[in-house]
Structure formats: C-alpha cells, structure tokens
Amino acid sequence: MQFPSLSCGILIKRYKRFLADILLPNGEQITLHCPNTGAMTGCATTGDTVWFSTSDNPKRKYAHTWELTQTQAGDFICVNTQRANQLVQEALEKRWIAELAEYQTVLPEQKYGSENSRIDFLLKADNQPDCFAEVKSTTLLTENDLGMFPDAKTERGQKHLRELAAIAESGQQAVILFAILHTGIQRFAVAKQIDPQYAALFEQAKNVGVKVLAYKAQIELVLGKPISMNLQFSCEI
C-alpha cells in the first residue's frame, strides 16, 4: 500500500482526541485531523515527527490528516487506523496472508451478528464456509519490544469478540487479525492489564475456534521524484 504524498512537522500536542497541533519547517503552526480514537500511548509525544496527508476537498474543516509518527527513537507508527483495513484488504486480495489465501472473494464492511455489527471483511471461497475477519490496528509498544492490544478499554472490541465467538460456534470461520503498525514491535500479546474483560473474551473466543493472526506492517519512506528547488531558502526540522 502506498501513502499519498506526505509532508512533515513537529508535534506540539494532541487534544480533543481528533486534533493535533504541529510546527512546520517554515515556523507555521497548523492543526491536523487525528483519525485515531485510541489512547495513542507512545504515539503522540511532543517533539516527535508527524507525517501528514493533505486533502483538496474544500468541505473539510481540517485539510490535513495525521498518517504517521516518527518517534525520537526512530520508529515509525501508522496512527491512521483506517490504513490498517486498507493494508489488510490489499493483502487479502493479493493472497499474501497464507492462512487466508484460499478465499477468492473479499467483501469489506458486511453486516452480521446479533449485536448490529459490521465485520471488516467477509471472505468467500468455493466449497468452504464463509470466513469473518476482524482487523485490529495495533500500535502500543511496551517493554522488551512487546506490542499489545487494546491500548484503552474497548466495549466495541469486546462486542466484536462476542460476535466472532458466535460465528465460530455456528460452524463458520472467524478470524481476528492484529495489524502491527509500529516498527518497534517484535512480539504481540493481549493487554489484560488495560482491559481485563477484553482479555477474558479473547480467551473464550480462542477456545471456541476463533483464529488469531498477527502480521507486522513494513513502514518505510523511500526516495521519490525530483522536485524544483529554491536555493535562497532552506530549513531543518
């Protein structure tokens, strides 16, 4: 998956969950939309480098969207939770996920379950039961390179586990895929200390046959096309 063209600045603060102020290289301060409802622990430290996209939609109140954090330790984190589903959808359609490569049809955002839910992806294949796949963006880095989910209590996440467990018990396939979007994470575990109820439901779901996958994204910046130059002005972040 390729990001749109990104610009960068230095994070001043995140506030009201969905907003963040950053300082651009030219000294201008702007406000970004933050597309992440989580605690963003370790992803929003003052002084980190923020990479953002810019929309040309005139109806948007905030034209800029926070996409990546580059921490002062050098790690990259994708904080736009929508990117997790886009990344996984591409991987499913190209059959890059070995455990799910048998499914030919990928249907995003399908209604299902008894709690008025939407599954991230409904997967279909000839002569196979349907597979219901839920994606969780994972960015919380703890000690010893351990990544954890959730980073805050999540009633919505608890509901998803109940729905997936019911699917598995009905004889269909159910999968929860943790998309690791922090380059510093090397291992994964459920954050029982943050949301004990989620951890309990996770164990129940596993025990009734919900499959658990964790895939780490490769996040990198690469050299792009040449641009015009103004040699009379330069700045550094």
Swiss-Prot record:
Pfam families: SfsA, SfsA_N
Molecular-function annotations in GO: DNA binding
Superkingdom to which the source organism belongs: Bacteria
Record-linked NCBIfam families: sfsA
Similarity remark: Belongs to the SfsA family.
Name assigned to this protein: Sugar fermentation stimulation protein homolog
